Amino acid sequence: MCKCGVEFRLGVLSKPNQKNMNKKYYYYIIFGITFLLFNLVQDNIRPNYDGGNSLIIYFLGVIPNFLPGIGLPSFFYVIIPEVFKPHSFFFKERLKLSIYISMFGLISNEFITIFTPGRGIFDWNDILWTLIGGGLFLTIHRKIN
């Protein structure tokens, strides 16, 4: 290791503290990928799918709820530290809050479809897959950390 804190391990330059600093970028990448896929499915694949496979139709129906269930908590998880101070309640509880806020918003959006005709169709499967997406985010978070 040199004086600047950089060491050479297995042919790769690394800084010991750099690993923790770059973890937030995983969450930005997760957010970007999920919302890119969301738009791809919602705007291109679903409207143009003419097949009769009921399983594919089912998954094309729930993916727009599943992907934001992963992406929104990921986004909130990295945004909360940018807004709140490190010793605040929001900073300390950012994992729970990011999941709670995302799930509340996404599930509320699904219930709004009951009262707004033409905005969508209420479906319990969408709520289930939103919760599964939130659970997958929690699993991904545990793997990252």
Short names for language-model regions:
Residues 3, 20-145:
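Bulky hydrophobic segments
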Residues 3-5, 9-20:
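Short, Lys/Arg-enriched N-terminal segments with co-localized hydrophobic residues
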